[in-house]
Amino acid sequence: DDELIVAFLDMVENHKMIVENSGLLTVAALRHLDVKGKKIVSILSGGNMDVITMSSVVQHGLIQRDRILKVSVLIQDKPGELVRVASVIARAQGNVIKLDHNQFVSTNRNAAVELKITLEAFGTDHKNEIVKALEDAGCRPKVIRPSL
């Protein structure tokens, strides 16, 4: 399934085509063959996919390619901390999609607050740069699997 999701995302992003799973099998299989310099024909079929399924497949593909990631960081419960973390992400060219910040979990005002950030990256290298920037800023990031 994962290989079909990546093949689907490739077809949408690179060729602006919506192809259903039966048509994606050859595209996914070609990733495992040495076809460089050879003329290959892959028959693509079907576009019979509902919008909800398509959205889910695209999101799964973006997660697999490290284009969407979720990071948990611990911050102090004081004014300016949220801005500081957002600034670190912005300087690293990350784009915040969703933020989960709940300071009412603990009754101890001196306790750290967990901040869960879902963000966009350009791929694995960029994801690693963002995580490193958060580490360098003392945020102790932990990458967690995004939920859809």
Q: Where do the PLM segments sit?
A:
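Histidine- and/or cysteine-centered catalytic micro-motif in compact active-site loops
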Residues: 1-2, 45-47, 76
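Active-site-adjacent helical/loop segments in soluble small-molecule enzymes
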Residues: 1-38
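Short alpha-helical
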Residues: 3-6, 25, 49, 80, ...
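Short, surface-exposed loop/turn motifs that are enriched in glycine and acidic residues
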Residues: 15-19, 44, 74-75
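Catalytic phosphate/nucleotide-handling subdomain of diverse soluble enzymes
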Residues: 31-59
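A conserved regulatory-domain signal marking ACT and ACT-like small-molecule sensing domains
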Residues: 51-148
